[in-house]
Regions:
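Solvent-exposed interaction patches of small proteins and small membrane subunits
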Residues: 1-93
């Protein structure tokens, strides 16, 4: 079981809300809305996705990585490397 599962419903609600934002963006473009208004909504959707990503990363560190470290062995190094790679991807995005 993964660390985020206790907040699964919350994550799903947030992702559904983001999905609605993206559908709204499609509608705005279809309706020829003003560029800046669309960009403002793109920024809001991007920020919402970043918030989900940071929450999942926090869950990964506090559950998956912490558990692997407590168990010892090579699994800890693998989990730390995965977390480091995920952080690098988030920073680049």
């Amino acid at each position: 079981m993964y660390g985020y599962t206790h907040d699964k419903d919350s994550y799903l609600r947030r992702l559904r809300r983001i999905e609605g934002q993206v559908r709204g963006l499609q509608r705005m473009i279809d309706e020829d809305n003003y560029c800046i208004d669309i960009l403002t909504q793109v920024a809001a959707a991007t920020k919402a996705l970043q918030s989900v990503a940071l929450g999942l990363l926090e869950e990964h560190l506090s559950h998956c990585v912490a558990q692997a470290v407590a168990e010892g062995g090579d699994g800890a190094a693998v989990k730390v490397r995965e977390a480091s790679d995920a952080i690098a991807r988030l920073v680049r995005s």
